[in-house]
């Protein structure tokens, strides 16, 4: 057998694999628009026209066209509850029932199942919690981006991190949520390809869904841990700090530690001074102004500028709120 020369059959195979991956990414991006818009009929039509979805298409046909719903590895009583949510998703995203009508049908079904026909939604939520917790599950109910959907998982693991920040080290606790059974509507519609990565508890603790994160990634270590730890430090150091000021400082910390130039571009794309009630948009607008004269193609320049702005803003905060003792474990 002759050796393959560079650029021969092996290179062709590699090219075909890379091209195939490019097509798959493009297809994923295109079909994601259907899911984001809650258009399951459109998604199914798209899948029928694209060979790369042939393996998953039958699952969509079974649920949405035939009404053959999924059963989960939980007790029957809990499956009965989750079935009502699945019917709500089919009604809303496939059958075209207005969300308000589908929600009314869902809530009526849940009340009947739990034998609380006249319960207000708050009481219904309490009963749902109790039913799942009695079987050893954690649960969160309510709406995500306008649609009902429960989060059901088996284990919550508080994990303490020592987070390096520009002015010292902060201790920050993250709840890692493991063993998910159900992760609301987007996860259900996409069989786990898309979905919520976590949320903040009322006390500010971040809850991270284990399957949604690479815990060695910059997304977790910088955009989540350092961002949220900086919030914690700033709220202790400057009790009167505004949401816009909090976000501005946390974004600067991200930019200082990030190895990705695309992060700055992401913030610039979010800048919008007309959205005065949106702390993220306003913070990004300030960043856009203050990085206008920075070489945005140079990572060291971006990192240095971010640190310079953070220190200047700390001086501004101390003048505004009074100098407090620095919160640091390092």
Regions found by a protein language model. Give the residues of each.
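Post-HEXXH active-site segment of zinc metalloproteases
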Residues: 217-219, 235-252
């Amino acid at each position: 057998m002759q050796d393959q020369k560079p650029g021969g059959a092996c290179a062709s195979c590699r090219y075909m694999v890379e091209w195939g991956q490019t097509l798959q990414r493009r297809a994923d991006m295109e079909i994601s628009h259907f899911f984001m818009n809650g258009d399951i009929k459109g998604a199914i039509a798209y899948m029928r026209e694209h060979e790369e979805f042939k393996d998953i298409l039958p699952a969509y046909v079974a649920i949405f066209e035939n009404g053959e719903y999924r059963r989960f590895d939980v007790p029957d009583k809990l499956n009965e509850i989750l079935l009502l949510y699945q019917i709500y998703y089919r009604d809303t995203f496939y059958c075209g029932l207005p969300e308000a009508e589908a929600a009314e049908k869902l809530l009526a079904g849940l009340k009947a199942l739990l034998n609380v026909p006249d319960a207000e939604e708050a009481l219904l939520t309490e009963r749902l919690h109790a039913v799942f917790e009695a079987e050893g599950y954690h649960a969160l109910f309510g709406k995500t981006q306008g649609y009902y959907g429960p989060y059901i998982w088996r284990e919550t693991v508080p994990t303490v991190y020592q987070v390096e920040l520009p002015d010292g080290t902060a201790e920050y606790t993250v709840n890692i949520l493991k063993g998910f059974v159900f992760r609301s509507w987007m996860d259900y519609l996409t069989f786990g390809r898309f979905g919520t990565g976590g949320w903040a508890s009322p006390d500010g603790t971040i809850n991270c869904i284990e399957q949604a994160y690479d815990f060695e990634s910059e997304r977790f270590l910088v955009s989540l841990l350092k961002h949220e730890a900086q919030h914690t430090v700033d709220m202790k150091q400057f009790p009167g700090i505004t949401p816009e000021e909090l976000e501005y400082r946390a974004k600067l910390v991200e930019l200082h530690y990030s190895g990705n130039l695309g992060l700055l571009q992401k913030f610039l794309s979010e800048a919008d001074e007309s959205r005065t009630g949106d702390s993220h948009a306003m913070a990004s607008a300030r960043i856009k102004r203050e990085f206008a004269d920075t070489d945005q193609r140079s990572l060291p320049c971006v990192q240095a500028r971010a640190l310079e702005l953070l220190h200047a803003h700390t001086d501004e905060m101390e003048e505004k709120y009074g100098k407090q003792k620095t919160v640091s474990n390092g």
